[in-house]
């Protein structure tokens, strides 16, 4: 796994070098590469570009099953994908604002001076403080004001996480319903998984591999290329 970092182009080149070091020549006849995600245009050696929706849906089918609702909370957007018969039936996407994404939690954890895991641990013991702004910039200003007023950090942490989870639950609740599957980096945040299940009224299923659902789906799609 190669972190994207600032430049998708640099990450793409590092990945090509890592593949070569592992014995995979991207130009070889028996090697196929699929690019997906926001950096997909920065992979010149890709044999095909496939949408995130398709790749996450395919990966979720492999990890969980062929029907249900996939919730992917990424760094730049949140996706809700309905699966039927192992295929994507419909989807919804929030890519207009970071306030309902993992990036929002990262920003707020930085503002609180703690890691995302520490924020989740603190939130368990906190009372929810309402974060009402729908915009990341304004929400950050709210958090700064709360800190200035001496609001306990655990309460702010609870409010921040609840604000994200409630937005995600609203999106997911408009889909087909349970079973719900969580993919993306937030699947490793046990508190987020629990709170999302509480708001949806149904357990949210995930797995240690769920953060790689998009990559898994892309690999499966690559296997099918001639």
Task: Give residue ranges: language-model regions.
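Glycine-rich phosphate-binding/hydrolytic loop that grips phosphoryl groups
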Residues: 102-106, 207-226
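Phosphate/pyrophosphate-binding loops at sites that engage ATP/ADP/AMP, CoA/4′-phosphopantetheine
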Residues: 16-31, 168-179
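Short glycine-rich, Thr/Ser-proximal phosphate-binding strand/loop in the N-terminal lobe
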Residues: 1-18, 89-96
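Adenine-nucleotide phosphate-binding core of ATP-dependent small-molecule kinases
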Residues: 139-173, 211
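Glycine-rich phosphate-binding loops at beta-strand->alpha-helix junctions
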Residues: 38, 172-199, 210-214
């Amino acid at each position: 796994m190669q972190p994207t970092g600032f430049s998708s182009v640099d990450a793409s080149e590092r990945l090509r070098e890592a593949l070569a070091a592992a014995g995979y020549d991207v130009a070889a006849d028996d090697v196929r590469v699929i690019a997906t995600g926001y950096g997909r245009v920065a992979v010149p050696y890709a044999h095909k570009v496939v949408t995130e929706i398709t790749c996450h849906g395919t990966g979720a089918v492999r990890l969980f099953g062929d029907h249900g609702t996939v919730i992917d909370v990424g760094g730049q957007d949140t996706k809700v994908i309905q699966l039927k018969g192992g295929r994507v039936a419909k989807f919804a996407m929030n890519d207009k604002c970071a306030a309902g994404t993992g990036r929002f939690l990262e920003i707020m954890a930085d503002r609180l001076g703690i890691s995302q895991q520490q924020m989740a641990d603190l939130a368990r013991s906190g009372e929810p403080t309402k974060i009402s702004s729908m915009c990341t910039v304004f929400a950050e200003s709210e958090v700064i004001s709360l800190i200035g007023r001496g609001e306990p950090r655990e309460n702010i942490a609870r409010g921040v996480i609840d604000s994200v989870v409630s937005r995600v639950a609203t999106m997911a609740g408009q889909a087909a319903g349970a079973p719900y599957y969580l993919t993306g980096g937030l699947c490793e945040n046990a508190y987020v998984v629990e709170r999302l299940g509480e708001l949806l009224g149904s357990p949210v299923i995930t797995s240690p591999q769920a953060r790689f659902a998009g990559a898994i789906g892309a690999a499966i799609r690559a296997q099918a290329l001639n």
